[in-house]
């Protein structure tokens, strides 16, 4: 079965990692390409048409056809989807200037209960979750490839200066909620390699793209992540070699 991997811009590091593993270790060829950036997740981007899931976002739809030569997601393909756990929209919301998760017990801040926080996460992920529900309902059984750990914010350039413990707690709880939601639907998630996180749970500089990019992992990170993806897939879905697209 062919392994196709697509998703948001975090897929770029995965593509570099897949290419390195093919060249250096003889891994079976895969088709790995990003569809677009994570800001596209804030609006509906998929629908069911004629019993198949299609992408309604114009950029996503164009990339799917260009790089995967398909117009819809079908059960005969094995899909790894890199969507979810890009939690920057959540923990960079200005509402956290006056509020804090209730489980942290921060004095002087309006407590956000666990139930309310779960609703915040569900609202942020609503279109991603709708996409996965659509895939399942049409017989496609995807797995999820998580976004990397968050990059430690630069205090000189970050506008919303939250305590690091609070920022990381928000991210961690959001990841747990997403994993639980996926688990209830029988969807596996491949999480970032533990060795890529520092002692506070942020992406180590050695694995971050760096420069003016505050979000993404680098090619070294992508290589480690793709090795973990292939280890996961070796247990559940034998791969069928395909011609790599230019």
Predicted regions and their residues:
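Well-ordered, non-membrane alpha-helical segments in soluble/globular domains
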Residues: 57-67, 114-132, 164-178, 222
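Oxyanion-hole/transition-state-stabilizing segment in secreted/luminal serine hydrolases
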Residues: 67-118
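Substrate-gating cap/lid alpha-helix
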Residues: 152-191
């Amino acid at each position: 079965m062919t392994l196709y991997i697509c998703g948001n811009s975090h897929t770029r590091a995965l593509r570099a990692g897949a290419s390195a593993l093919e060249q250096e270790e003889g891994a079976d060829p895969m088709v790995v390409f990003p569809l677009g950036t994570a800001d596209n997740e804030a609006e509906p981007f998929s629908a069911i048409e004629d019993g198949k899931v299609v992408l309604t976002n114009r950029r996503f739809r164009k990339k799917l056809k260009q790089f995967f030569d398909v117009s819809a997601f079908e059960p005969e393909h094995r899909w790894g989807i890199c969507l979810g756990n890009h939690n920057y929209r959540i923990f960079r919301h200005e509402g956290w200037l006056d509020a804090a998760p209730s489980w942290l017990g921060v004095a002087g801040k309006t407590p956000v209960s666990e139930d309310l926080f779960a609703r915040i996460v569900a609202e942020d992920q609503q279109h991603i979750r709708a996409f996965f529900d659509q895939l399942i309902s049409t017989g496609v059984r995807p797995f999820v490839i998580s976004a990397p750990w968050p990059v430690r914010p630069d205090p000189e350039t970050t506008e919303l200066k939250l305590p690091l413990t609070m920022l990381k707690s928000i991210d961690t709880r959001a990841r747990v909620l997403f994993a639980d939601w996926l688990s209830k639907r029988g969807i596996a998630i491949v999480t970032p390699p533990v060795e890529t996180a520092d002692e506070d749970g942020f992406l180590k500089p050695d694995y971050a793209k760096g420069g003016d990019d505050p979000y993404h992992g680098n090619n070294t990170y992508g290589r480690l992540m793709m090795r973990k993806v292939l280890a996961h897939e070796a247990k559940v879905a034998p791969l069928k070699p395909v011609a790599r697209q230019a």
